[in-house]
């Protein structure tokens, strides 16, 4: 008689994905971030559900309802800060997960990688709309500035913006629809994540050496369930430190002022995890050009499988590519810093140089490095 997890239709699926899944024996801690992202999504959906029970998506009461959650709801402050900082945690894990994929050549699993890019876009859209909901100053002006970018689209731009707004400015209709989309998108993300896993399990996981691991596989459980559990413990410890000791560290003080269409904040900027893209957007003086650069800053990830020139998959034994990878990480750190600075010298020039460097490293220097390394290894 076969054991239930191998015969029951539902448990069989779980078994193949998380228990008897053959996994490479040498995957490192960098492979923990997939499961950690799943945990982040669960935390966000759970905390978001409880917040939605008390939140009202009306311009007159939205700000007050968030204050009510923090003051009057049992542990409302905790749920609110878990949700707000959970978004930051989500993006930390997301960026580390993508960085891992670039470093070890995981992008050569094209289907998995492309679904991952779609997941990134969906997550960014969800986070943006969630930031609008508290209806503080930065919520309102952030929504106004970012949605207004669509007016740069030739011919249909203005109509498109007014259609998204549901009027002639960011108002009640905008807030209501953003709440509706913010509620539904995480479930779409969850479905897309399952597709992401489906494609991954078609090929099996990559490993740090970037070589086939079919000859040396181990079961996912207990080895990687235990390893993931360690990652979960570390992550939750760091997360709760933030939530309980520094809940407002990553937020904007302006968002503690109710939205006022008659008073523009001195520096309109998004949350820290969008600053690199915001810096790229601002580095181009032309509105349409900036919007295109903004979209391309994420879409450029789709070029990695196409521009992979090296005969080795992983960067583990490719020092020139390693140098360029860390240069890219440093460049993104500079862009993040610039995105939070006012538009004035010397920040304008630094932002423009960093933006050019960002695209140059990915589109020109990394493929060249791969070819040079092939020559050096006489491949």
From Swiss-Prot:
Topology versus the membrane: Multi-pass membrane protein
One Gene Ontology MF term: ubiquinol-cytochrome-c reductase activity
Cofactor(s), by name: heme b
InterPro entries in the cross-refs: Cyt_b/b6_C, Cyt_b/b6_C_sf, Cyt_b/b6_N, Cytb/b6-like_sf, Cytochrome_b, Cytochrome_b_C_euk/bac, Cytochrome_b_N_euk/bac, Di-haem_cyt_TM
GO cellular component labels: mitochondrial inner membrane; respiratory chain complex III
PROSITE patterns with a match to the protein in the record: CYTB_CTER, CYTB_NTER
Residues spanning the membrane: 33-53, 77-98, 113-133, 178-198, 226-246, 288-308, 320-340, 347-367
Keyword Repressor tagged: no
Entry keywords, A to Z: Electron transport, Heme, Iron, Membrane, Metal-binding, Mitochondrion, Mitochondrion inner membrane, Respiratory chain, Transmembrane, Transmembrane helix, Transport, Ubiquinone
Protein location: Mitochondrion inner membrane
Details of cofactor binding: Binds 2 heme b groups non-covalently.
Chain's role: Component of the ubiquinol-cytochrome c reductase complex (complex III or cytochrome b-c1 complex) that is part of the mitochondrial respiratory chain. The b-c1 complex mediates electron transfer from ubiquinol to cytochrome c. Contributes to the generation of a proton gradient across the mitochondrial membrane that is then used for ATP synthesis.
Similarity annotation: Belongs to the cytochrome b family.
Subunit structure: The cytochrome bc1 complex contains 11 subunits: 3 respiratory subunits (MT-CYB, CYC1 and UQCRFS1), 2 core proteins (UQCRC1 and UQCRC2) and 6 low-molecular weight proteins (UQCRH/QCR6, UQCRB/QCR7, UQCRQ/QCR8, UQCR10/QCR9, UQCR11/QCR10 and a cleavage product of UQCRFS1). This cytochrome bc1 complex then forms a dimer.
Protein name, UniProt field: Cytochrome b
Gene: MT-CYB
